[in-house]
From Swiss-Prot:
Protein name in the entry: tRNA modification GTPase MnmE
This protein's record includes keyword DNA damage: no
Pfam family, one: MnmE_helical
Species in which this protein is naturally found: Dichelobacter nodosus (strain VCS1703A)
Subunit structure: Homodimer. Heterotetramer of two MnmE and two MnmG subunits.
Keyword annotations of the record: Cytoplasm, GTP-binding, Hydrolase, Magnesium, Metal-binding, Nucleotide-binding, Potassium, tRNA processing
Domain called TrmE-type G: residue spans: 216-373
Main subcellular location: cytoplasm
Length: 450
């Protein structure tokens, strides 16, 4: 990114629509807008009706021009928005005119990156812009808004300030060590360390909830043929998404659907029935099913509840053990289907449902939400990403080591160093500590017009 260049991009989705918006940012934004509108003076923050012209003077469209002079704009630079009639030809003609008059095409996320570099928002807030756009549920939308408003950043900054003050206090013990002032021994440092560690762990738990709303979970329906996996998929989605027949082995390939449960995005996979097969196509489907289980966060292991013979039960137990070994990280929930065909339901730790009648489905949904970790109060959750989680886990580890150094070895230098490293890890979240590579990676995932 070259900061002194003026950039432009289409800020609205491609295709036919009511309005198209061209966004321009940089020192030449006002001059470019004057050339396109043929108006000598653009009143700041006022919508002005204008014709739009290309480099040859031919009229392109009629619409609205808005001018936001620096520093009171989204990017902190001079910003202009040209709002024309929606349509592919109009949008591209307006964009071409901005480029002809001196702008260059913006890179993905470059408007938001300039806002970050001009201190209009920190890195966590910048990421929240993209998360807001990609939110797939109302819970995710509200959480992204909290991050954009600075709720997450304020918590990070407050914790960073505490760690900095604590580090100064510890380092003071080094400066006054010869004066027989026992800073470490008086207990205040340990008390503050424990408090900071607890706040970090609370923040980590809230961030994990935010990541859950952002990334969702991978949920796999697995089991023997004819257990009712495809019927359950259809029951959960409320539509006939998968083919259901009495014939075992109907599902040959994985059927994937994105779904929302209690505000959590769920990547749902219905898999082929797991059994020995001589059919080459079915064998490939079974192999893919095992791969899906390996990647799952939650596995719903379905059993045919109407199959009461000992052989069927033994096969199910064997499959259960095999899948647990295959995916030790995943959470498993045993689900007994076809409750409508059974008079007596005894299932130990499993749930009874009927995909056909819908019995037990509501209980199953609540159980899935619980397994996914939906347990935070809505007003405390903000959107978070994997890198935020990793940074907070690093902070937690450094504070735990600092506490260990304090309690076991009483070495102030090592305590101060762990506090310094914890403080640096926090800085990577809001961007007070960042590299060009990290910034490029983050902003390259944005839309061109953002």
């Amino acid at each position: 990114m070259i900061a002194n260049e003026t950039i432009a991009a289409i800020a609205t989705p491609p295709g036919i629509g009511g309005v198209c918006i061209i966004r321009i940012s940089g020192a030449q934004a006002h001059a470019i807008a004057v050339n396109i509108t043929h108006k000598k003076n653009l009143v700041p923050r006022q919508a002005i009706l204008s014709h739009f012209y290309d480099l040859s003077g031919e009229q392109i469209d009629q619409g609205i021009v808005l001018y936001f002079p620096a520093p009171h704009s989204f990017t902190g630079e001079d910003v202009v928005e040209l709002q024309g009639h929606g349509g592919i030809a109009v949008a591209h003609a307006l964009l071409s005119a901005t480029l002809d008059f001196g702008a260059r095409l913006a890179h993905a996320g470059e408007f938001t990156q300039r806002a970050f570099l001009n201190d209009k928002l920190d890195l966590a807030q910048a990421e929240a812009v993209a998360d807001l756009i990609h939110a797939r549920s109302q819970d995710a939308l509200r959480a992204a808004n909290r991050s954009l408003q600075g709720v997450f950043s304020q918590k990070i900054d407050a914790l960073a300030d505490e760690l900095l003050r604590l580090r100064v206090y510890v380092e003071a013990s080094l400066d006054f060590s010869e004066d027989e002032i026992d800073f470490l021994g008086e207990g205040k440092i340990r008390e503050k360390l424990v408090d900071s560690l607890q706040k970090t762990q609370q923040l980590l738990a809230q961030s994990q909830q935010g990541q859950l709303l952002n990334d969702g979970i991978h949920l796999v329906l697995a089991g023997k043929p004819n257990a009712g996996k495809s019927s359950l998929l259809n029951a959960l989605l409320g539509e006939e998404r998968a083919i259901v027949t009495p014939q075992a082995g109907t599902t040959r390939d994985i059927v994937r659907e994105d779904w929302i449960i209690d505000g959590i995005p769920v990547h749902l996979s219905d898999t082929a029935g797991l059994r020995e097969s001589q059919d080459l196509v079915e064998q490939e489907g079974i192999r893919r099913s095992f791969d899906a289980v390996k990647r799952a966060d939650i596995v719903l292991l379905l059993a045919d509840g109407s199959a009461r013979d000992n052989d069927a039960r033994a096969e199910f137990v064997s499959l259960q053990e095999e899948l647990h070994q295959l995916a030790p990280h995943a959470q498993f929930l045993v689900v007994y289907n076809k409750a409508d065909l059974v008079d007596e339901q005894t299932a130990g730790d499993g749930l009874w449902i009927s995909a056909k009648t819908g019995a037990g489905i509501e209980i199953l949904l609540k159980k899935i939400a619980t397994l996914a970790g939906k347990n935070q109060h809505e007003e405390t959750v903000f959107i978070a990403r994997k890198r935020h989680i990793h940074a907070l886990e690093s902070v937690e580890a450094h504070l735990q080591r600092a506490l260990q150094q304090l309690e076991q070895f009483f070495v102030a230098e090592l305590v101060a160093e762990e506090l310094r490293l914890a403080h640096l890890a926090l800085g990577t979240i809001t961007g007070t500590v960042s590299s060009d590579d990290l910034l490029d990676e983050i902003f390259s995932g944005f839309c061109i017009g953002k």
